[in-house]
Amino acid sequence: MASVKRVVVAVMIVNVLALIFVGVAGSTRDVGSGGDDSEGARGREQQQVQQHEQNEDRSLFERGRAAVTGHPVRTAVGLAAAVVAVVSLLRLLKRRRRRAIQEESKESATAEEEEVAEEE
């Protein structure tokens, strides 16, 4: 059960990172105009290939962006999932810290009892 929760939290974190990455990439993406056409036919051919690749990249990027942030509800759900993931991660860390402290206190209590028993 705990491993399932960890997987869910990991998926949520990846979702948040994807939202952030797509948002940042969308605001900073700059597609060039192609280049200089002074090389004649070879230059035009390279420019056409480059333009085609850029259009393909742009369409893939836009489809990915639309899939992640295309709808306000989807974005809100993604952000809610991020909040849940962070809260779950913090709770998990808090539990681990408590367990470690409890184990240390048990070990120290056991060690003290052994010392008292040896002295007697």
UniProtKB/Swiss-Prot annotation:
Q: Which residues form the signal peptide?
A: 1-25
Q: Which GO terms describe its cellular component?
A: membrane; symbiont-containing vacuole membrane; transport vesicle
The residues that cross the membrane are: 76-93
Composition-biased stretches (Acidic residues)? 110-120
Asked if the keyword Transmembrane belongs to this entry, the reply reads yes
Annotated region described as Disordered, given as residue ranges: 27-59, 100-120
The protein in question is named Dense granule protein 5
Q: What is the lineage of its organism?
A: Eukaryota, Sar, Alveolata, Apicomplexa, Conoidasida
Name the gene. GRA5
